[in-house]
Every structure is written in C-alpha cells, then in structure tokens.
C-alpha cells in the first residue's frame, strides 16, 4: 500500500509473485486504468522506459468537450505543457468526445496536460497497450496474467 493507504498493483499479486521482486515498468496516474507491465528485469524496464527507444504507449480517453480536427492536429504536432513541448504523437478520433492517443514518451500527467493545452479535460483515461502488447480485454480490473510466448517475443525483439 502507499503512504495514504491506497492499494498498489503489487498488492494485487499472490504472495509467491511478490517474493520474486516484481515491480511495475512505469506507472499510471491514480485515476488512470489499464495495462501495467510487471517485471523483475531492471535492464528491460530501463530499456522500455527510456525516451530514446520510443516505446509506444497507447491510451483510450474520453473528454469533457468535443474534440475537433484542429485539436487532433495540435496534439499530434506537440503542445506546450508547462514549458515543455510534447513529442509528436498519433491521435485517432473515434467519437465526438473519444479518442486513442499513442505516445512515445511519458511525462507526469502528460495526456491530461495535453488536453488542457487544447482547452479540454480528460474525464476517463485507460492505457490499452504498452510496447506493442495490448491489454487483455478479458481481464477484469485489478486482475493479472502471465505474458504469452508471442508477447515475450515482442519484448525480446525490442530488447
């Protein structure tokens, strides 16, 4: 648990998996749902999280206000989030207030700040893939599974 008593992803694991030193490869903000990769390989985690390797992280999000094609263009080109211009990204509009964004960096509250830069607000955010591995749609929130052989191969090809 965290200092404020909140449950962490490690708290959700069986005791035998906690003992082998698993840790999250990256993080999700408190109100963000979705895919978290757990590993006990520090070199792999460092590689996947290093901005120079441009590992893709894909998020589904919903906004308070409709998203325009101008918003999409601005987000894709990079926006100022407090003195930092975000790297180019991909945005797929899938509804008036719904989209999927693919980032290759992971600044603190980045998507929320990016949407604020185009005068909008994130009301729901979920990571749906990391390093070309997609969230298993059959998993319930708070549950986990081992990677498949093909998913391990994806990571080995990158690493």
Feature roles, as predicted:
Residues 1-159:
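Basic, flexible Lys/Arg- and Gly-enriched helix-loop patches that mediate nucleic-acid binding at interfaces
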């Amino acid at each position: 648990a965290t200092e404020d008593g909140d449950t962490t992803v490690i708290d959700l694991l069986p005791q035998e998996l906690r003992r082998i030193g698993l840790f999250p490869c990256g993080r999700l903000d408190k109100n963000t749902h979705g895919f978290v990769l757990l590993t006990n390989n520090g070199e792999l985690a460092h590689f996947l999280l290093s901005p120079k390797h441009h590992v893709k992280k894909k998020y589904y999000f919903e906004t308070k206000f409709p998203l325009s094609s101008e918003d999409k263009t601005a987000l894709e080109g990079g926006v100022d989030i407090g003195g930092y211009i975000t790297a180019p990204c991909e945005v797929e509009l899938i509804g008036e207030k719904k989209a999927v964004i693919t980032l290759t960096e992971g600044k603190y509250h980045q998507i929320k700040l990016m949407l604020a830069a185009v005068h909008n607000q994130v009301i729901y955010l979920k990571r749906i893939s990391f390093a070309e591995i997609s969230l298993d749609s059959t998993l319930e929130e708070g549950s986990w599974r081992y990677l498949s052989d093909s998913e391990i191969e994806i990571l080995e090809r990158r690493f």
